């Protein structure tokens, strides 16, 4: 079984898919990375924690997770939280775990207060530490978004 999550970036007039998270069968659990540097110990990576969290409750086969990091560390954009949430979603799909959206949210909350935001497939307003979510009627259709990463570290821990 193989799973991957592709992020689609609008560049010019086209949309270009970039595989940002890939999960493949392996003899033992492993994490590999490419793209931007990810500081810290591998065991502290939220993708690793997401796998081990689900492994406590489900009989998961060993896998290799490959993460292509495109959101800068410390940007305050929830890059690690989104990686964790999408790992949960992808594992749920690949292993046919049939975890409900509500339970995925509960698992995500154990990984970080803003991880639940990335389980949702709609625009949400996050308040508190990011754990209180309210749907809002908003679309990015026909809008441009500019994201600026100043030369400062924004910790979301």
Language model segments and positions:
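Residue-level signal for inorganic ion chemistry
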Residues: 17-19, 47, 80, 147-148
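A short glycine/serine-rich beta->alpha loop
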Residues: 32-41, 70-77
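ATP-dependent small-molecule kinase catalytic core of the GHMP/sugar-kinase superfamily
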Residues: 1-10, 96-157
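N-terminal, positively charged, Ser/Thr/Ala/Gly-biased leader segments
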Residues: 1-34
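Helix-rich "cap/lid" substructures immediately adjacent to catalytic or cofactor-binding pockets
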Residues: 43-71
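Solvent-exposed beta-strand sheet faces enriched in polar/charged residues
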Residues: 22, 32-34, 66-68, 107, ...
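DPxDG-like acidic metal-binding loop motif
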Residues: 75-101, 117
């Amino acid at each position: 079984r193989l799973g991957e999550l592709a992020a689609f970036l609008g560049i010019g007039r086209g949309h270009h898919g970039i595989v940002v998270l890939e999960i493949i069968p392996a003899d033992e659990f492993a994490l590999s990375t490419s793209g931007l540097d990810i500081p810290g110990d591998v065991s502290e990576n939220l993708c690793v924690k997401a796998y081990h969290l689900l492994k406590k409750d489900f009989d998961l086969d060993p896998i290799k997770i490959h993460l292509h990091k495109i959101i800068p560390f410390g940007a305050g954009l929830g890059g690690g939280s989104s990686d964790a949430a999408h790992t949960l979603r992808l594992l749920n799909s690949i292993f046919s775990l049939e975890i409900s959206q509500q339970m995925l949210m509960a698992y995500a909350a154990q990984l970080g207060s803003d991880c639940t935001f990335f389980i949702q497939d709609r625009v949400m307003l996050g308040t508190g530490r990011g754990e209180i979510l309210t749907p809002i009627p908003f679309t990015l259709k026909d809008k441009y978004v500019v994201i600026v990463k100043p030369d400062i570290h924004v910790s979301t821990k």
